[in-house]
Amino acid sequence: MADTFVAKNWRDLIKPRRMEVDQDSATPTYGKFVAEPLERGFGTTLGNSLRRVLLSSLQGAAITTVKIEGVDHEFTTIPEVSEDVTDVVLNLKEVLLRMHTNETKTLRIEAEGPKEVKAGDIITDPDTEILNPGHHICTISEGGKLRMELTCRRGRGYTPANVNKVAGSPIGTIPIDSLFSPIRKVNYQVTNARVGQVTDFDKLSLEVWTDGSVSPQDAVAYAAKIIKEQLTVFVNFDETEEPVVAEAPKEEAKLNENLFRSVDELELSVRSANCLQQANIKSIGDLVQRTEAEMLKTKNFGRKSLKEIKEILAEMGLSLGMKLENWPPKQAPAPAQPKA
């Protein structure tokens, strides 16, 4: 179990209120996300980590091999087809897929000229979608025929052609390079954020471009989940045994008589007391329902005042950010009678 004082290493840090999405610029393939406030340095730490995971670790689908009827290798031509095999393979690499299964699938193209063959001409099954059906693959002349089989699967990152080569494949099967990542580009920027009178916080702005097989918002969520799962091995204690006052049962919070005391009884510094008075916080019950971010927005209220109040509340078994239903109560509890 984590020691109470050790737990302050992470519980005392400011957390971002939420992740905001720029709805004005959002598209199915682009998203801009903003998280603030963050402790100084956390903007770069989180931004760089999310960027690396987004670009390297998210799964996608891609074509891995192609077999063209009448073709034995990629360094040749196809009768009545304008593009040679190398050009056709290059065009197939840019076909965007979405797969709803982890199984390897075989797709087909069966076309006769004259015709411009596009990605939309690929014959799929219910588990596979073509996301860019207008993408050009090749052009067949009058009298020409094209038959090909395409193998596709899910994966992550980049896989070179030699890795996609499967032992025992029929002669004429051509392995191709596969870019599985659904992420096309990621940018992040860290700027200053203000919380009340304090300006030494970070604001993280993250821009994500995808190929359309996953939404930018889902991509960020998946990346954050990957980071979270990878970091759990470094936590060498069980925090579930540590009681968190802010999440205590509401019945216990109501029975804490300190909630009904005036904040004047806290013996705060003059600055802190004036800030509470200015914010119209009269009782400790009013105080504990304020979050750290809300307190820091109070004029002249800084980190020193925040630390002072948190330490005093902790001695009472209370904390900021508590949720008290039906506050203030209609009738405060009677003061405890002295023992005989």
UniProtKB/Swiss-Prot annotation:
GO terms for molecular function: DNA binding; DNA-directed RNA polymerase activity; protein dimerization activity. Keywords: DNA-directed RNA polymerase, Nucleotidyltransferase, Transcription, Transferase. GO terms for biological process: DNA-templated transcription. Residues 253-340 are annotated as: Alpha C-terminal domain (alpha-CTD). GO terms for cellular component: cytoplasm; DNA-directed RNA polymerase complex. Its EC number is 2.7.7.6. Belongs to the RNA polymerase alpha chain family. This is DNA-directed RNA polymerase subunit alpha.
